[in-house]
């Protein structure tokens, strides 16, 4: 009687010698998992003996060469079955709908053979990739999204893999790799799930080809870096994140004692030595001499260190440790680490290439950056303070557009909302209001006198505009990017706003701290527009329109952390609550939300 083939398996326990056993109880389940149906087997010797001699002769002489037997391993059938069902039972996020089509293409091109195993052993590239997945936190990602713990444990098992186990680990690693490359290239959450107006073109990504390349390289980071944002701000933030994770592990050494409600310079506080150590860890205490243990007076470099810390947090740097500063000092790492993770996610939404050097407006930082080169390096950019829309009232939307032209000495065409709700009541109460504030009424495209019947008609066929001049709400120049929100960049006569630390005070538009510098920067490729001509145009009595040689991309972004090349890290308040929204969506886990959020109100009242 024919004997069934025997498979011997390896088993080991702590402190015991390896034991090899025959897995008959698992035999049926493995065939079931692999989709293999057992058949009645006929011993080859009995089959040959049953054939007539003539048939044997024909078999020997008629066939020029024997056909190779097609042997389908159980692991191949299991891979095909799991991908066909788009489900992997060992993974935390078992539904493979997000990566299934790409992985079916990958495995089909390999005849459903293993990607990460060779001779039943994990390859070197596979082990390198598993280490990268385990360190995904250094990229601001969550290693559990990629089942890193399960893969690390699988890679640590001794001996060669059972074919069914091999198939499951192989597919699990492919799933993790596919999810990782997508997260690095596009981010996990769709930007439109947080900002409905933030529409970006989606590049194609050949995931099967990327995984095929990863399977052949022992240095996966080299390939993965090519998917990540090429901008220096992203990489500085990644290095800062790694440093803050290390500091968080040591932060127990710098827990501050109970502090008074307001600690002011010159006061005594027993926790001053600890405060100095904490500020030194954060890079804000610049005195390299040993910290005096007995000095408990809040003065000198300790005060300067607190001021630097406050400035990096977006606070007024007055050196007084009140509620807000004390709260930040009490949680200096964990909350800041999460801010970095959220900001890195936002950087991954950005395009990898720009047609021309862009302008970035970071809303919570109240800063504008106009770049001269495509590398986005700080040594070739123009930076200035800005005023943005008021939180929870007239917020500046997060979106992208292109600057097409500027207007020197512009009119301000008052939006219908402001005209009807603010200007009309004021003009009805005070007939001199319009003249005093340099407003004029326009009907059917022509200016009309500020008579009562026309004032009554404001919002009903009568428009309001403010004539050019230094008093104009748009200042002496505005920069136009046509959009549905009526948001643009402009000058402002209210220069005192730029003295504030927190500058969300507009109706939604971006007020510029140095509009002349931006005009000169954007017209640098038009030599006829000299500094003298630009200043004269800004003081003109009538509007002057100048188109740019090429549209300039503008990104109104929302990053609550910025790292600088000198090692400084600046944290900004979540003024619109967008970080809270993104944090909530990321905590959902796979599948991350990809649908659009509710659109912001439009149009935004300007300026």
Model-based region annotation:
Residues 13-15, 28, 35, 54:
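Residue-identity detector for glycine
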Residues 70-202:
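Cationic-aromatic interfacial patches
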Residues 52-62:
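Bacterial N-terminal signal peptides
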Residues 67-108, 171, 175-179, 198, ...:
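Well-ordered beta-sheet/strand-loop patches within structured domains
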Residues 27-31, 39-40, 46-49:
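Basic polycationic patches enriched in arginine
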């Amino acid at each position: 009687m024919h004997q069934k083939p025997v498979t011997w398996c390896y088993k080991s326990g702590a402190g015991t010698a390896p034991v090899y056993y025959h897995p008959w109880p698992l035999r049926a389940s493995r065939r079931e998992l692999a989709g293999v149906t057992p058949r009645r087997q006929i011993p080859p010797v009995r089959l040959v003996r049953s054939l007539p001699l003539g048939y044997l002769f024909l078999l020997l002489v008629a066939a020029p060469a024997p056909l190779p037997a097609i042997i389908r391993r159980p692991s191949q059938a299991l891979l095909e079955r799991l991908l066909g069902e788009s489900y992997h039972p060992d993974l935390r996020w078992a539904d493979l709908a997000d990566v299934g089509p790409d992985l079916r293409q990958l495995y089909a091109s390999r005849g459903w053979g293993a990607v990460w195993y060779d001779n039943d052993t994990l390859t070197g590239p596979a082990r390198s990739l598993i280490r990268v997945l385990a360190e995904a936190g250094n990229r601001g990602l969550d290693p559990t999204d990629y089942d890193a713990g399960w893969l690390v444990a699988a890679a640590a098992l001794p001996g060669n893999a059972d074919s069914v186990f091999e198939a499951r680990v192989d597919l699990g690693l492919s799933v993790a790799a596919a999810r990782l490359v997508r997260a690095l290239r596009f981010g996990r959450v769709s930007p439109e799930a947080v900002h409905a107006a933030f529409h970006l073109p989606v590049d194609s990504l050949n995931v099967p080809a990327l995984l095929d390349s990863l399977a052949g390289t022992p240095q996966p980071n080299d390939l993965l870096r090519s998917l990540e944002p090429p901008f220096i701000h992203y990489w500085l933030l990644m290095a800062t994140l790694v440093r803050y994770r290390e500091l968080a592990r040591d932060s127990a050494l710098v827990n501050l004692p109970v502090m008074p409600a307001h600690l002011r310079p010159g006061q005594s506080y027993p926790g001053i030595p600890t405060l100095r150590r904490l500020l030194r860890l954060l890079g804000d205490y610049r005195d390299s001499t040993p910290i005096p243990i007995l000095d408990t007076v809040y003065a000198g470099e300790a005060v300067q260190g607190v001021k630097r810390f406050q400035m990096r947090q977006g606070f007024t740097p007055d050196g007084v440790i009140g509620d807000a500063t004390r709260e930040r000092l009490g949680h200096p790492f964990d909350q800041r680490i999460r801010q970095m993770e959220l900001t890195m996610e936002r950087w991954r939404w950005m395009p990898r290439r720009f047609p021309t050097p862009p302008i970035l407006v970071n809303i919570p930082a109240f800063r504008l950056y106009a770049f001269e080169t495509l590398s986005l390096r700080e040594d070739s950019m123009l930076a200035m303070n800005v005023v943005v829309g008021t939180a929870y009232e007239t917020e500046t939307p997060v979106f992208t557009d292109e600057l097409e032209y500027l207007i020197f000495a512009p009119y301000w065409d008052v939006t219908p909302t402001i005209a009807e709700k603010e200007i009309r009541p004021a003009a009805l109460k005070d007939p001199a209001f319009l003249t005093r504030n340099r407003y004029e009424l326009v009907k059917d495209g022509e200016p009309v006198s500020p008579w009562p019947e026309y004032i009554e008609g404001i919002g009903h066929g009568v428009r309001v505009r403010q004539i050019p001049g230094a008093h104009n709400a748009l200042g002496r120049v505005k920069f136009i990017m046509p959009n549905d929100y009526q948001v643009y960049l402009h000058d402002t006569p209210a220069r005192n706003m730029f003295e504030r630390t927190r500058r969300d005070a507009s109706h939604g538009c971006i007020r510029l701290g140095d509009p002349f510098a931006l005009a000169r920067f954007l017209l640098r490729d038009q030599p006829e527009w000299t500094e003298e001509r630009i200043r004269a145009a800004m003081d003109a009595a009538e509007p002057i329109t100048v188109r740019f040689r090429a549209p300039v991309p503008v990104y109104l972004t929302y990053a609550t952390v910025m790292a600088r090349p000198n090692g400084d890290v600046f944290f900004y308040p979540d003024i619109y609550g967008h970080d809270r929204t993104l944090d909530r969506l990321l905590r959902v886990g796979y599948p991350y939300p990809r649908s659009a959020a509710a659109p912001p109100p439009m149009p935004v009242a300007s300026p």
